[in-house]
């Protein structure tokens, strides 16, 4: 029920009836015709650029062509007025009957209103969070978690076949550091005096319970094993414990992944998957033996002037070629990236979305180049970067540092301000823009707190129905009866609310296609503002109140409008991952 797509089709049909031709007598390309909300609502309900984009190829004056198109569109049964504006835009004003019928249809769809097929079932992998399994989630992980999860929800609602994925980085050097940190806590649990945690190890107290559990299970047994054997056991236990903690932390934020992919599986069986992926690129001519030029500026300690196995990534859009094998014969981190991306392609995904922190900006070109080399045009890879979140309390900055053990955990933030405030506010800026998060402001009960303002609109919708039940003596209100009464809505404020609701399906499609879930948060705030504004009009003018005891038909019509607002607020908040409350507590 995307009215903008509907009217784009109607405008296109009207243009086709004009039988326009270019200088060669060929019909022009009509794919650039668009119908959108006008920038100024006073200009009408819809605006089309058709005359503007077709004037040049058909050799016509855009305004004269717009006049012809406007004349044709006035014959549409739902168009009350079609007027030419500016250099050649056509503004349409629709009849009240169209909006009333749209409200009735919306009530029929309920919370499925806005669900789309624009994704056409494309198999999509959204990878997000993927924090190292070395400790609890901290607030720095919140933004990527929310952006990735909300985007996946949005795309699924728009018709994509979405898998939410978390890659467990359980094969790197940080896992050795974790294992040694846990062994220290294990020794402490056995009674050893460990003193200060040595530099380079994880000092957080969150490892103490794990050390105690190992002491209870093994006694002194781990100390009596060969070091490598003991470390392997401890690392396995530590990864399991950290991932259980991470899953629990994410659940507090209402984040749940479909797949947890272990990086270790890429290195299993003599790194079979990595070797296979490199062999595949070799057969395609993307691998060669050569030397990398020295990096600009001061050379890093691990740089070597030697012949290496290299991925020719500059041929597919990267800034430099990438090494795949270290001097000791082991594979580089990038080699694991090669195998992991190929694994996703082998699983049938055609849209690969990586949600990463802004500090991973250097990964964008190499991942894009890798996708081109592995799958050509068959796969679309997009990296979304999430900028930093700065924490404040009453305007004063809060500092955090994971390695020092002194950091603000995700759990602490959820317990203080609630899941909904975090989920909504992490989307209230575009993901690549910096975000200030003030604990005091996100718990304010005011219009300046977007999540409160939107949830308050949801609660108000439900309060209207409670009031109507009391005053009319009706326990339940059937959607069909509410929809049937929609023709009674003629007030401009009521029609304006329906217009705002009608933007939702277009918003869903455009936000999903652009991979911008923040648009949903902005829209919900605008819808809540429109609803609160109409509520306030009823406060000043009793004739505009939702419940009119002496006019049951009009009351049912207005209740239908309130139900529609509630449906869209609930739908949008659900996609964001926040609750749509029935009352504020």
Swiss-Prot record:
Motif ('HIGH' region): 131-141
EC number(s) stated in the UniProt entry for this protein: 6.1.1.19
Keyword line: Aminoacyl-tRNA synthetase, ATP-binding, Cytoplasm, Ligase, Nucleotide-binding, Protein biosynthesis
Subcellular location: Cytoplasm
Record-level GO cellular component terms: cytoplasm
GO BP annotations listed: arginyl-tRNA aminoacylation
Reaction equations catalysed: tRNA(Arg) + L-arginine + ATP = L-arginyl-tRNA(Arg) + AMP + diphosphate
Gene Ontology MF terms in the entry: arginine-tRNA ligase activity; ATP binding
Alphabetical list of SUPFAM superfamilies matching this protein: Anticodon-binding domain of a subclass of class I aminoacyl-tRNA synthetases, Arginyl-tRNA synthetase (ArgRS), N-terminal 'additional' domain, Nucleotidylyl transferase
SMART domains: Arg_tRNA_synt_N, DALR_1
Assembly description: Monomer.
Family: Belongs to the class-I aminoacyl-tRNA synthetase family.
Protein name according to UniProt: Arginine--tRNA ligase
Organism: Mesorhizobium japonicum (strain LMG 29417 / CECT 9101 / MAFF 303099) (Mesorhizobium loti (strain MAFF 303099))
């Amino acid at each position: 029920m995307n009215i903008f797509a509907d009217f784009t089709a109607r405008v296109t049909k009207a243009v086709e009836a004009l039988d326009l031709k270019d200088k060669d007598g060929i019909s022009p390309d009509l794919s650039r015709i668009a119908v959108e909300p006008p920038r100024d609502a006073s200009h009408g309900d819809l605006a089309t650029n058709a005359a503007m984009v077709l004037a040049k190829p058909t050799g016509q004056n855009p305004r004269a062509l717009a006049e012809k198109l406007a004349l044709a569109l006035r014959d549409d049964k739902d168009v009350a007025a079609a007027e030419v504006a500016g250099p050649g835009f056509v503004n349409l004003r629709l009849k009240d009957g169209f909006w009333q019928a749209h409200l009735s249809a919306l009530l029929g769809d309920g919370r499925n209103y806005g669900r789309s097929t624009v994704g056409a079932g494309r198999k999509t992998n959204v990878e997000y969070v993927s924090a190292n399994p070395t400790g609890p989630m901290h607030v720095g992980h919140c933004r990527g978690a929310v952006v990735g999860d909300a985007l996946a929800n949005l795309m699924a609602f728009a018709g994509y076949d979405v898998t939410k994925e978390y890659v467990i980085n359980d094969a790197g050097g940080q896992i050795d550091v974790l294992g040694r940190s846990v062994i220290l806590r294990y020794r402490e649990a056995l009674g050893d005096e460990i003193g200060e945690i040595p530099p380079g190890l994880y000092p957080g107290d969150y490892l103490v319970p794990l050390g105690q559990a190992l002491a209870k299970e093994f006694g002194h047994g781990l100390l009596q094993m060969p070091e490598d054997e003991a470390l392997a056991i401890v690392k396995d236990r530590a990864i399991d414990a950290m991932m259980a903690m991470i899953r629990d932390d994410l659940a507090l934020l209402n984040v749940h992944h479909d797949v947890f992919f272990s990086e270790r599986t890429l290195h299993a069986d003599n790194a079979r998957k990595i070797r296979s992926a490199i062999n595949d690129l070799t057969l395609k001519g993307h691998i060669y033996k050569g030397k990398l030029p020295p990096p600009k500026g001061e050379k890093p300690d691990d740089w070597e002037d030697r012949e290496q196995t290299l991925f020719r990534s500059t041929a597919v859009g990267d800034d430099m070629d990438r090494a795949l094998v270290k001097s000791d014969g082991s594979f580089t981190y990038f080699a694991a990236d090669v195998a992991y991306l190929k694994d996703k392609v082998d699983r049938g995904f055609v849209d690969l979305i990586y949600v990463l922190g802004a500090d991973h900006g250097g990964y964008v070109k190499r991942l894009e180049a890798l996708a081109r080399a592995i799958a050509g045009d068959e796969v679309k890879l997009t990296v979304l970067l999430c900028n930093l979140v700065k924490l404040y309390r009453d305007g004063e900055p809060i500092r955090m540092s994971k390695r020092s053990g002194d950091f603000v955990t995700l759990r602490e933030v959820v317990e203080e301000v609630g899941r909904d405030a975090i989920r909504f506010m992490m989307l209230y800026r575009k993901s690549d823009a910096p975000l200030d998060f003030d604990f005091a402001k996100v718990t304010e009960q005011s219009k300046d707190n977007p999540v409160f303002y939107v949830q308050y609109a949801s609660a108000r919708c439900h309060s209207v129905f409670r009031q109507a039940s009391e005053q009319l003596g009706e326990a339940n209100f059937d959607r069909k009866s509410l929809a049937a009464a929609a023709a009674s809505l003629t007030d401009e404020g009521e029609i304006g609310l329906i217009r705002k609701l009608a933007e939702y399906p277009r918003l869903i499609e455009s936000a999903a296609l652009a991979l911008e879930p923040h648009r949903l948060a902005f829209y919900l705030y605008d819808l809540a503002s429109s609803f609160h504004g109409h509520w306030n009009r009823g406060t000043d003018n009793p004739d505009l109140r939702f419940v009119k005891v002496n006019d049951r038909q009009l009351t049912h019509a207005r209740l239908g409008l309130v139900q529609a607002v509630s449906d869209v607020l609930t739908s949008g908040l659900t996609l964001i991952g926040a609750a749509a409350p029935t009352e504020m507590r």
